[in-house]
Regions:
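Short alpha-helical "packing" element that flanks the helix-turn-helix/winged-helix DNA-binding module
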Residues: 49-50
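Charged, amphipathic alpha-helical coiled-coil/dimerization segments
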Residues: 30, 58, 80-138
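Helix-turn-helix DNA-binding elements, focusing on the entry/boundary residues of the two helices
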Residues: 61
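The alpha-helix within a helix-turn-helix
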Residues: 65
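C-terminal regulatory/oligomerization modules of transcriptional regulators
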Residues: 1-10, 113-116, 128-156
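Central "turn" residue of the DNA-binding helix-turn-helix
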Residues: 41, 57-58, 69
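N-terminal leader segment of winged-helix/HTH proteins
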Residues: 1-40, 134-135
Length: 156
């Protein structure tokens, strides 16, 4: 039996797709984080929202969505759940009622210290693989920016 890839050289296989390599790596990394985050009662998207807020607190929903590359319709339910858990507050901006501001609570700020296990896990994985994460992060950030530019040119 012949390899189907040899019969269709112009068609890229799944393993040759950049999008699949990134997607499957992301899935594996999410699985690596899951046991640590479940101890905190968090999902990965909730965790990255908190990471952004630990970096810069008291932001608008729009600014947080832009920082996380999430649409408002995805971010709002996530923030409502975090608010229900007591990690943040959502309040209307007194200067513009259309704007919702996000602020960490004391509980949300305290969670940062507990989340260090998840971060240590990733760094341990990189150390075991003898990898310096900095160049990977820089390359992926550059790739993201280029993809966003192409998406804008294509009207996406």
């Amino acid at each position: 039996m012949t390899d189907p890839r040899s019969q269709t050289p112009d068609l890229a296989t799944l393993d040759d797709q950049l999008c699949f390599a990134i997607y499957s790596a992301n899935t594996a990394i999410n699985r690596m984080y899951r046991p640590y985050l479940s101890k905190l009662g968090l999902t990965y998207p909730q965790y990255i929202a908190l990471l952004a807020l630990w970096e810069t607190d008291d932001v608008t929903v729009g600014a947080l969505g832009k920082r996380l590359y999430l649409d408002t319709n995805t971010l709002t339910p996530l923030l409502k759940r975090l608010e229900g858990m007591g990690h943040l507050t959502r309040t209307r901006d007194p200067k513009d009622e259309r704007v919702v501001r996000i602020r960490l609570t004391d509980q949300g700020r305290a969670l940062q210290a507990q989340a260090t296990d998840a971060l240590a896990c990733v760094h341990a994985m990189a150390s075991e693989a003898d990898m310096d994460l900095k160049p990977w992060i820089e390359a992926l950030n550059h790739l993201r920016e280029q993809a966003l530019k192409k998406a804008q040119c294509a009207g996406g």
